[in-house]
Regions:
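...captures the hydrophobic TM-helix bundle architecture rather than a specific catalytic motif
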Residues: 1-196
Length: 196
């Protein structure tokens, strides 16, 4: 919430869609070009990611999801598939053009590292669970983290160790498509797993 309020205070709108709100591009460009306020956009975007990380159960905010599996199975299906855990992934995906075009690519780097650690940690913990629902919860955490890894690394140029927004249409599009495809397939099959 602090990141959203911080962002809207400096930009003047809650509408983050660059296609619908053409005035947002000029405001973000001016904000990124101002040396005194260059910290505002990366800070606001990272704070928004922290909020999404809590919803998507990223490490260290992952504790709530395995404990939520005590509920009825249809509730577990909704939490895993459609409503709660995919909110953070969708948030990062919808803000991806702002991350890339306006100099907040370093935050994508942090998102990728946090998500990669979460993916391996949750997968290892899932293998040690004796309760099937807790194992599925950690499996979901791992899969959500893989989606965020795809979004976080899709603009990283390994040739020179920096981000390159010129490759947005090809490489960035592939990472975005991989994350969104995995989001939909995971939602479909995890819901079927719980409900069938």
């Amino acid at each position: 919430l602090i990141g959203i309020l911080f962002f809207s205070f400096y930009v003047g709108t809650f509408n983050y869609d660059l296609n619908v709100n053409p005035g947002l591009v000029s405001k973000l460009t001016a904000l990124a070009a101002n040396p005194a306020l260059a910290w505002v956009l990366p800070t606001a975007l990272f704070l928004m990611f922290i909020g999404g990380a809590g919803k998507s159960a990223m490490f260290p905010l992952h504790i709530w999801l395995p404990d939520a599996m005590e509920g009825p199975t249809p509730v577990s299906a909704l939490i895993h598939a459609a409503t709660m855990v995919v909110a953070g992934v969708f948030q990062v995906a919808s803000l991806l053009p702002i991350y890339v075009q306006f100099g907040a690519q370093e935050q994508l780097h942090w998102i990728a590292w946090i998500a990669a650690f979460t993916a391996f940690y949750a997968a290892a913990v899932a293998c040690t669970q004796r309760d099937i629902k807790r194992g599925l919860a950690f499996s979901t955490i791992s899969q959500i983290a893989y989606m965020l890894v795809a979004l976080g690394v899709c603009f990283y140029d390994s040739r020179n160790g920096s981000f390159n927004s010129a490759e947005y249409l090809h490489h960035g599009g592939l990472g975005y498509m991989a994350a969104m495809f995995h989001l939909f397939t995971h939602a479909m099959f995890k819901a079927l797993l719980f409900l069938c």
